[in-house]
């Protein structure tokens, strides 16, 4: 074949193009990584999540697409468990190759998606607003907020700026708990969940750590709680919710004696109490799917209802254990949420 014949052979030229072009037969197009940024390096979740990202094997899990590229330390000086840990976790991430930046805005310039991992729920609203404004999908670690008004303000901000977000405790997606949401053919009549329930004075009592057990309770029961009553003492907490269909769900918070996580579920033809915590990997898998454009694994409205359950329990405990309606609690908090959001938006506009 002469040089002129080789150049002029359409079939040959086409075969060479197919053999070498990206995405050609035999060569799948490379899936670009999702550049992730973390806001808040004062919790063990940060280094645990980062380790799962690093160890994920391409082709086996969507987590392998996540690449932690930047982080903003944040931190809260008035919470010792935040202030005392932030330097260590920041160093650990920096040493692993993560760029540490000095502002949320600097982080947003470098990433495709965000994890708000700040330990302090009071900081989440201010941190989430610029993330929503930048159009980045966002996972907000527990607790969503310190109280219901802030949680509602997060949702209002997301609606205003069309932000995509979800929040969850890792307990929700542990397989022996998540199965109750996956298999909707089993009739659940009630559930009893428990978890450690340490207190933090800047948060509603059940928001700080009781959120884990309440999230497990809601995974089994689903949304639709109407009233909550709470009994409280130094060593324990018991909150009883009545759902709109008459079912009853119970959360027991443990502060004294042996502590652990658990869930008993009472069904029409079964009683099961074999739920157990199985680590962060199931949650991180859900985060990866969501940040990659997948469906939202927990409806925002359900997360807001969980915060309303917590606030109603707070009110009930202060008033001697009277029943407190979630819809009334939500209505009062909404007024405060609108005020708080406007304050934050005004601050942002002046910067």
Task: Kindly give the residue locations of the regions a language model identified.
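Short helix/strand-capping hinge loops at secondary-structure junctions
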Residues: 135-137, 142-143
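N-terminal export leaders
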Residues: 1-11
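Bacterial N-terminal signal peptides
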Residues: 9-23
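Hydrophobic residues in well-ordered beta-strands that form the structural core
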Residues: 102, 140, 165-167
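N-terminal glycine-/serine-/threonine-rich beta1-alpha1-beta2 phosphate-ribose binding loop
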Residues: 3, 25-134, 156, 160, ...
């Amino acid at each position: 074949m002469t040089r002129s014949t080789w150049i002029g052979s359409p079939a040959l030229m086409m075969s060479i193009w197919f053999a070498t072009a990206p995405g050609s037969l035999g060569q799948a197009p490379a899936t670009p990584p999702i550049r992730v940024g973390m806001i808040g390096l004062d919790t063990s979740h940060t280094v645990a999540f980062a380790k799962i990202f690093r160890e994920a094997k391409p082709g086996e899990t969507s987590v392998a697409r996540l690449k932690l590229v930047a982080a903003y330390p944040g931190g809260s000086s008035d919470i010792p468990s935040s202030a005392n840990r932030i330097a260590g976790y920041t160093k650990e991430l920096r040493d692993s190759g993560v760029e540490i930046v000095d502002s949320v805005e600097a982080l947003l310039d470098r990433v495709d998606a965000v994890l708000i991992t700040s330990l302090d729920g009071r900081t989440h609203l201010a941190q989430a607003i610029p993330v929503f404004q930048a159009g980045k999908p966002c996972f907000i670690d527990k607790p969503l907020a310190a109280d219901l008004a802030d949680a509602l303000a997060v949702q209002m901000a997301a609606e205003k700026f069309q932000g995509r977000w979800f929040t969850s405790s890792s307990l929700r997606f542990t397989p022996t708990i998540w199965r109750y949401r996956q298999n909707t053919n089993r009739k659940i009549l009630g559930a009893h969940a428990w978890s450690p329930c340490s207190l933090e004075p800047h948060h509603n009592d059940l928001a700080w750590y009781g959120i884990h057990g309440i999230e497990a309770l809601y995974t089994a029961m689903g949304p639709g709680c109407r009233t909550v009553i709470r009994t409280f003492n130094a060593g324990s907490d018991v909150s009883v919710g009545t759902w709109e269909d008459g079912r009853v769900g119970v959360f027991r918070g443990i502060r004294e004696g042996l502590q652990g996580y658990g869930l008993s579920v009472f069904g029409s033809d079964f009683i099961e109490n074999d739920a157990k915590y199985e680590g962060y990997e199931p949650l991180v898998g859900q985060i990866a799917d969501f940040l990659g454009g997948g469906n939202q694994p927990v409806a925002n409205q359900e997360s807001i209802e969980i915060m309303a359950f917590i606030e109603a329990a707070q009110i009930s405990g202060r008033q001697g254990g009277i029943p407190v309606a979630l819809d009334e609690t939500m209505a009062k908090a909404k007024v405060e949420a609108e005020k708080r959001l406007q304050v934050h938006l005004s601050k942002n506009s002046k910067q």
